[in-house]
Amino acid sequence: MDHHSKAKELLQQRDELDGKIKELMLVLETNNSTMDSPLLDAEGYPLNTIDVYAVRHARHDLICLRNDRAALTEKIVVEMENENKEVSGQTATSEEKPVHRTSNEPFVKISSVVELSPADIGGFRKDDLIIQYGNLHHGNFNDMQEVAQITKQSEDKIIRVTVIRENRPVRLEICPKKWSGPGLLGCNIVPISGANV
């Protein structure tokens, strides 16, 4: 199987995961619950206003599916990059031009992520250090307005992001979109101390 076909197959698998994630998110929303909201009352009894069993299972499955999605995304990026190497000047599934970073030095970081937001579903985690955000990197970053502009221009589109997490690079695909919370991402991105802001 060639790289394009493999990437397409992986994308289909990820779409299926996204569908399951949405179903599980609906279970939590229906029960007015989040990933860490209480399931017991003050006396230690299960709340009778929610389906405790369903919420517990939804939380567990969401954690598993998020991990599976992150692993799939990394495989997809690898297949796309391999295809790009074979087909000069052609991009697999993205209109983004290749970005050549001058360094792997982070320039902004994630200070908080709202549960079940586009940022959360896309794989952002608190304290992720961003070394590439679309075509932005440490070498061409000037101010936070650039991050906001890329986010706004990429509504309902994929932004390729590379972060440093636990001292290793992690590639993500973030899709800014309108959701039940504020903004298009549901996370707080702040400049790193010493960055050119």
Swiss-Prot record:
Its recorded name reads: Probable 26S proteasome non-ATPase regulatory subunit 9
Q: What does this protein do?
A: Acts as a chaperone during the assembly of the 26S proteasome, specifically of the base subcomplex of the 19S regulatory complex (RC).
Q: Which residues form the PDZ domain?
A: 75-166
Top-level division of the source organism's lineage: Eukaryota
The entry sums up its family as follows: Belongs to the proteasome subunit p27 family.
**Keywords for this entry?**
Chaperone
Q: Which GO terms describe its biological process?
A: proteasome regulatory particle assembly
Q: List the GO terms this entry assigns under cellular component, sorted alphabetically.
A: cytoplasm; nucleus
Tell me the organism: Caenorhabditis elegans
Q: Name one Pfam family in it.
A: Nas2_N
Q: Which InterPro entries does the UniProt entry name for this protein?
A: Nas2_N (IPR040815), PDZ_6 (IPR041489), PDZ_sf (IPR036034), PSMD9 (IPR035269)
